[in-house]
Design a protein with these regions (language model features):
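Helix-centered, glycine/charged polyanion-binding patches within enzymatic domains
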Residues: 81, 86-152
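Charged phosphate-binding loop/patch that engages nucleotide di/tri-phosphates or the phosphate backbone
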Residues: 157-173
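Polybasic low-complexity intrinsically disordered regions
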Residues: 1-86, 90-103, 109, 162
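Short, solvent-exposed polar/charged micro-motifs at secondary-structure junctions
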Residues: 10-15, 115-117, 157
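Hydrophobic (often cysteine-bearing) scaffold residues that line and stabilize catalytic clefts
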Residues: 66, 126, 155, 159
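Structural motif
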Residues: 36-37, 148-158
């Protein structure tokens, strides 16, 4: 089982969204519904195992919908069951992934038929694993704040954070 989700990577304070010139043409303005926040920057999409090991990540502009990054994110993924949040709720995506051999589970909205049976608390608890990983990355490495001024610097910072985080899963004697 693998879990996918995304988090914002703002490059400036919200008051400067329309004046920002860093990463012009690459970053743009997006909305994060869980934080009720408009931000200028990127979105980092991650694929994580149940134990919290980061398998893959993709960086997109802030306005790119989560569904558009799924195929890049899961390419080469060995896990066949993928848990996601409401941002990935789509029949077309579910059908596309089924043809590739993946089973996509997303919770249903509360007003949808069968939501109480479908949204099992154990699956929801498993899905929260990735939220915990994002919190740890923010606490340990301050991943949501970047001082990178070029794409190479941004990529290097993210690679270093993922490497350092994943190395914590191995015991060195």
């Amino acid at each position: 089982i693998a879990i996918i989700d995304s988090f914002p990577l703002p490059l400036c304070q919200p008051v400067r969204n329309h004046r920002a010139s860093i990463f012009k043409g690459k970053a743009d303005i997006g909305y994060n519904a869980s934080k009720h926040l408009w931000f200028y920057g990127f979105k980092v999409h991650m694929l994580v195992t149940l134990s919290g090991y980061i398998l893959n990540y993709v960086v997109t502009a802030a306005s790119v919908h989560d569904i558009r990054a799924v195929h890049d994110l899961i390419s080469g993924c060995q896990q066949s069951v993928i848990l996601a949040d409401l941002g990935y709720l789509s029949h077309e995506l579910k059908d596309d992934l089924a043809q590739e051999g993946y089973v996509l589970w997303t919770p249903l909205r509360q007003n949808m038929v069968g939501a109480r049976r479908h949204n099992h608390w154990k699956l929801m608890a498993m899905r929260r694993t990735i939220e915990t990983r994002f919190s740890e990355l923010a606490r340990l490495f301050d991943i949501e704040h970047t001082l990178a001024r070029g794409l190479t610097g941004l990529q290097l910072r993210l690679e270093q954070i993922v490497l350092a985080y994943n190395l914590s899963y191995f015991e060195f004697n």
